[in-house]
Amino acid sequence: MSLAHINIFLAFTVSLVGLLMYRSHLMSSLLCLEGMMLSLFVMATMVVLNTHFTLASMMPIILLVFAACERALGLSLLVMVSNTYGVDHVQNLNLLQC
């Protein structure tokens, strides 16, 4: 395993630990999820480039599409919660139920 793979795995692990530690605020959770998706994208791109597996070359792009959708939904939820309650605590998400 090369140093680049170790760095990307470490970035994913740090983002996961950050998600587990700072899960009370929605903005912190979204930033940690974004770090996880970015490290997964870089890892998928490195795997495709190292293995020369041409059929899997679309996988990083599909991952970016899903990350963009996740980002848009997360930011819209953040705006809705902060406009409604004034804070971005995750515990306020339970109050949004009908």
From Swiss-Prot:
Q: Which reaction does it catalyse?
A: a ubiquinone + NADH + 5 H(+)(in) = a ubiquinol + NAD(+) + 4 H(+)(out)
Q: Transmembrane segments in this chain: where?
A: 1-21, 25-45, 59-81
Presence of the UniProt keyword Mitochondrion in the record: yes
Main localisation, per the record? mitochondrion
Top EC class for this record: translocase
User: What Gene Ontology terms describe where this protein resides (cellular component)?
Assistant: mitochondrial inner membrane; respiratory chain complex I
UniProt membrane topology term = Multi-pass membrane protein
rRNA processing in keyword set: no
Q: Which residues form a coiled coil?
A: none
Q: What EC number(s) are associated with this protein in UniProt?
A: 7.1.1.2
Pfam families given in the database record? Oxidored_q2
Q: Name one GO biological process term.
A: ATP synthesis coupled electron transport
* UniProt-annotated location(s): Mitochondrion inner membrane
Q: Which GO terms describe its molecular function?
A: NADH dehydrogenase (ubiquinone) activity
Q: Mind listing the UniProt keywords for this protein, alphabetically?
A: Electron transport, Membrane, Mitochondrion, Mitochondrion inner membrane, NAD, Respiratory chain, Translocase, Transmembrane, Transmembrane helix, Transport, Ubiquinone
User: What family is this protein classified in?
Assistant: Belongs to the complex I subunit 4L family.
* Function field: Core subunit of the mitochondrial membrane respiratory chain NADH dehydrogenase (Complex I) which catalyzes electron transfer from NADH through the respiratory chain, using ubiquinone as an electron acceptor. Part of the enzyme membrane arm which is embedded in the lipid bilayer and involved in proton translocation.
Q: How does it assemble?
A: Core subunit of respiratory chain NADH dehydrogenase (Complex I) which is composed of 45 different subunits.
Entry protein name: NADH-ubiquinone oxidoreductase chain 4L
Please report the organism this UniProt entry assigns to the protein.
Answer: Equus asinus (Donkey)
Q: What is the lineage of its organism?
A: Eukaryota, Metazoa, Chordata, Craniata, Vertebrata
